[in-house]
């Protein structure tokens, strides 16, 4: 059974005890996880009252241990977008399993106006939590033109089967630039962990 929660969210702040990177709008992200037994869904507007939808959904599903990391990763992946998120976790023992959020986003900014998708995952590892986020966004320009929009200090890290891979400046994760005709799909990946 899927529970639906409709909540509006505006600007968000990452939890201060978590170590994750801020990603610039051009840096966009995908992580795969097994299906959960419990789910929640929210519609979120980019310019509404501040709330933390990711933390709220995790709490409603019984996730306590990794709720802060999940929320910080979710806020990072959806930064600057209106979005809808569906959150899933593993049934009755939710706090002992990973929590996953699948995010559909719409950007309407001066530098990027399009749809994007993201996935955030946080899971207990020993006494702490670790997580990942991925955001995927298409750009209507060639990848060689998108490279200049990567964060300052970004460096080429080689290629994976011909797909360019970049280490993002400021320790913000990695980005793959996938050419698709005259367009470029940017896939950004970042990791996070509890630090306190």
Briefly describe each language-model feature range.
Residues 43-124, 190-192:
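N-terminal secretory signal peptides
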Residues 65-70, 131-133, 143, 147, ...:
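Short, structured motif recognition centered on aromatic/hydrophobic residues
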Residues 110-162:
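Long, charged/polar, surface-exposed segments that mediate recognition or autoinhibition
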Residues 194-196:
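Short, solvent-exposed mixed-charge patches
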């Amino acid at each position: 059974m899927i529970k639906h929660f409709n909540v509006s969210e505006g600007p968000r702040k990452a939890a201060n005890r978590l170590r994750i990177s801020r990603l610039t709008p051009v840096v966009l992200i995908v992580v795969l996880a097994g299906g959960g037994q419990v789910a929640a869904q929210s519609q979120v507007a980019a310019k509404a009252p501040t709330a933390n939808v990711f933390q709220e959904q995790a709490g409603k599903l019984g996730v306590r241990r990794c709720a802060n990391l999940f929320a910080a990763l979710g806020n990072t992946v959806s930064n600057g977008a209106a979005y809808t998120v569906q959150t899933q976790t593993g049934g009755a023992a939710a706090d002992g399993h990973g929590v996953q959020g699948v995010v559909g986003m719409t950007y309407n900014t001066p530098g990027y106006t399009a749809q994007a998708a993201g996935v955030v995952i946080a899971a207990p590892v020993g006494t702490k939590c670790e997580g990942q986020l991925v955001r995927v966004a298409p750009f209507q320009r060639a990848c060689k033109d998108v490279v200049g929009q990567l964060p300052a200090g970004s460096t080429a890290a080689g290629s994976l089967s011909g797909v360019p891979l970049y280490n993002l400046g400021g320790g913000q994760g990695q980005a793959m630039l996938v050419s698709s005709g005259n367009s470029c799909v940017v896939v950004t990946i970042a990791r996070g962990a509890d630090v306190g």
